[in-house]
Design a protein with these regions (language model features):
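Catalytic machinery of carbohydrate-active enzymes
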Residues: 1-210
C-alpha cells in the first residue's frame, strides 16, 4: 500500500469491483467519489441497489461505469482479443496439432467450487463417438503442469514451461472447440470468438459474467 501511495494517483478505474479493491479504496481514498474512484458503487444508477446492479452482465456494468466517467466505450460491449495472438507454428508442429479440442479443467486453488470433475468422462464419450477425429489437449498454467497429468489429454508446453498468454490465445483461436471451467481462458475464448462451452457452478450465472 505504501508503494501505491507513493505514485499519488489522481484517478482510479476499479473494474474488478471486489471486496479487495473496495478495501484499497477505504485505505487510499476513504472519502472519494466518482471524480477520484470509478467503481460500480460510485457510478451506481439512482434507481438500482448495488445488489440489483451486480446482476447485470459484466460488460454492461463496465460500459455504464466507464461512460459515467466520461470515457468513450467504442469496444467495451464487443471486445476482440485476437490482437494478442502470435505465431505458434512451432508448437503446432511439435504436437502435430490440426483438429483439436482444448480443455481447461483447472481453477484457482481457493475456488474449487468452479471445478467440474468429469472431464475424463467427457473425453471418453467424445472419443467413442468421433474416434480419432480430434486430439484432446490442455494448456496448463505454471502451477497446473503436474495436475494436467490427471487428464487423458496432451499437455501443451513450450520448452517444458507453460505457454505464454499470447501463445494460449493462438491455441484457443485455432481450436475446433473449447470446454472450460469458469476461469480466465474461458473468457479469452469468448473474446476470441472461439467455439466452445463454459461450465458454471452454483456460484454465478453465464449471464452475469457474459
Amino acid at each position: 500500500m505504501k508503494k501505491i501511495k507513493k505514485h499519488k494517483f489522481t484517478k482510479v478505474y476499479d473494474l474488478q469491483n471486489s471486496s479487495r479493491t473496495s478495501f484499497y479504496k477505504k485505505i487510499l481514498f476513504p472519502n472519494a467519489n466518482l471524480n477520484t474512484w470509478c467503481s460500480s458503487e460510485t457510478t451506481l444508477p439512482n434507481d438500482k441497489t448495488k445488489e440489483e446492479f451486480d446482476k447485470n452482465p459484466v460488460l454492461d456494468r463496465f460500459n455504464h461505469q466507464l461512460k459515467s466517467s466520461g470515457i468513450e466505450t467504442k469496444h467495451t460491449m464487443y471486445p476482440d482479443f485476437s490482437w494478442s495472438c502470435v505465431d505458434i507454428e512451432k508448437i503446432m508442429n511439435e504436437y502435430k496439432l490440426s483438429n483439436y479440442i482444448l480443455l481447461f479443467p483447472f481453477c484457482s486453488p481457493h475456488l474449487t467450487l468452479k471445478k467440474w470433475p468429469y472431464f475424463n468422462n467427457l473425453i471418453n464419450l467424445i472419443k467413442a463417438k468421433y474416434k480419432d477425429q480430434f486430439k484432446f489437449i490442455t494448456a496448463p498454467g505454471p502451477k497446473e503442469i503436474n495436475e494436467a497429468d490427471q487428464y487423458d489429454a496432451i499437455k501443451i508446453l513450450d520448452n517444458g514451461k507453460a505457454v505464454s498468454i499470447s501463445q494460449l490465445s493462438s491455441l484457443i483461436k485455432k481450436s475446433s472447440f473449447v470446454v472450460a471451467n469458469d476461469t480466465g481462458p474461458a473468457h479469452m475464448a469468448a473474446h476470441l470468438n472461439a467455439k466452445g462451452l463454459t461450465l458454471f457452478g452454483s456460484h454465478t450465472t453465464a449471464k452475469k459474467v457474459s
